[in-house]
Amino acid sequence: YHLREQVSTVTDVGIAHGEMLSLDNVYTSRLQMLFATPTGSTWQAPMGVLTYPCDGTTAAAGAFTPSSESPNPAPDLGAISVGTPIYVRGPANTALTSLAASVKLAAGGSDVPIRILTSANDPQAMLYINDAFILPLQPLQAGQTYAVFITGISDGQAFSKTFSFTPAATVSW
């Protein structure tokens, strides 16, 4: 869910960071981000269907633990690690429907099991009608290229997206 906001079509982002040492000597570090479009401004309108990771991305994480996210997008999976979520976004106020997808190891062609999360089946009811996540149900191997194939309907028009990305061994922020 947090990825959606980080790649949203807002025009302004505010960032604040603070650290605190508690009385029992525990360090707490907080990062606060505010995404907004000021009153009187217009959102940046994406053209067509967009994804993240993007074609050619090499700094995506290979693993993601849904239970570490709040709210949890896959509470039924427990504490297991899965692959990095692949975000799909259609133009604002249009529906993504009839989505089908596959994620394959590009070199060997082996399919990665996936789950497609949309506004229709989101357990937390957080996704908009133009949002979807493709969730690989196993961690992705660092340094290996994965091919992603997506088809569906956006704004009443059929679309298809094909791209590849390579998870990094470590992701430094």
Segments from the language model and where they lie:
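Extracellular/luminal low-complexity segments enriched in Ser/Thr/Pro
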Residues: 134-140
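Aromatic sugar-binding surface patches on proteins
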Residues: 125-134
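Solvent-exposed serine/threonine-rich low-complexity stretches and specific carbohydrate-binding patches
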Residues: 112-124
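Beta-strand-rich extracellular modules
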Residues: 151-155
